[in-house]
Amino acid sequence: MAKRDYYEVLGVARGASADEIKKAYRAKAKQLHPDRNKDCKVSEAAFKEVNEAYECLKDDQKKAAYDRFGHAAFENGGGGFGRGNGHGDFGSAFADVFEDLFGDMMGRRAGGGGRSRASRGQDLRYNLRVSLEEAYNGAQKTINVPGSVACAACNGTGAEGAVEPATCPTCSGMGKVRATQGFFTVERTCPTCSGHGQIVKNPCQECRGAGRVQKERTLSVNIPAGVETGTRIRLAGEGDAGMRGGPAGDLYIFIEVREHPIFMRDGRMLACQVPVSMTTAALGGEIEVPTIDGGRSRVKVPPGTQSGKQLRLRGKGMPPLRHGPGLNGEAGDMLIELAVETPVNLTARQKELLREFEAINADNNPQTQGFFQKIKGFWDEMKG
């Protein structure tokens, strides 16, 4: 069976550079590696063919001989090309594949001269903590966001000077190449331009051809009234800069509202616990309570108030988030839970008055009387 052209095997043009040949080989070897295609004889044969082609084309002397004489240059001992078991330098080949596999994950290929067509930047996330007062009133916050910005040296093109990106010679600008494996023809991403269809032959030295550089930016963010923990604010175009002039991603700000020393929040509802004196609880009266807007409101305490009683202030809770469909409406309420305070550090006279009060207080503690009646009934049943 006639051997296939080595350039065809690797999917590169005859005028391909050493870097282009190496990139094409890595992509092919990664795709056809035996670890990825176990028990597949077609892939195994194709993998050997790729290694054989690369062993020839990566060597300048062997490549020159092949370009002149084709496969005949290495027949009958010509040229001294030893194929061995068909794998060539397998250790080197595997190292190239390993580097390619994990190099992509670690971002070590960002400085290469291959990719060039514009692509959108990544979206970014920023967690922002605000106070409850800021969530109530709304606020303007200044934040520092690390990320990438368009390279000033090349205006985001990735090319040095006025050099324009060139059409990829491997895929002719299509971004895809076709490879034949046995009876199958497979279309895959072009290994030279990584699917972008263009290459930068003279990459910018500042950004190494990426069209963007790392830089921390200072942004002003408008926090609308009514936000709560989990609220997401989108700043369009404030994410990472795009590759080589592509559009920037978006910045998503996730709000976290800090706990408040006085108020507890549940949606639009606010709640707080307010102490009330024993006499005010017994006789009734008025007390002042703080509100989230920084003011104070007077509320009436009914006579005979017990600890845990709740009073409601209409419209004194959190405002609605005034952004988005279905989010408008009225402000929430504020619940006030009263805690009757037992007096401490009593004087002798105060103690005497309380004892006198207790002596004539038999019919004024219905809950206490009811409780002990239940206890008495319980013990009577046990004895019976």
From Swiss-Prot:
Repeat (CXXCXGXG motif) residue spans along the chain: 151-158, 168-175, 190-197, 204-211
Annotated cofactor note: Binds 2 Zn(2+) ions per monomer.
Domain J: residue ranges: 5-70
GO CC terms, sorted: cytoplasm
Binding site for Zn(2+) 1: C151, C154, C204, C207
Task performed by this protein: Participates actively in the response to hyperosmotic and heat shock by preventing the aggregation of stress-denatured proteins and by disaggregating proteins, also in an autonomous, DnaK-independent fashion. Unfolded proteins bind initially to DnaJ; upon interaction with the DnaJ-bound protein, DnaK hydrolyzes its bound ATP, resulting in the formation of a stable complex. GrpE releases ADP from DnaK; ATP binding to DnaK triggers the release of the substrate protein, thus completing the reaction cycle.
Protein name: Chaperone protein DnaJ
Source species: Paracoccus denitrificans (strain Pd 1222)
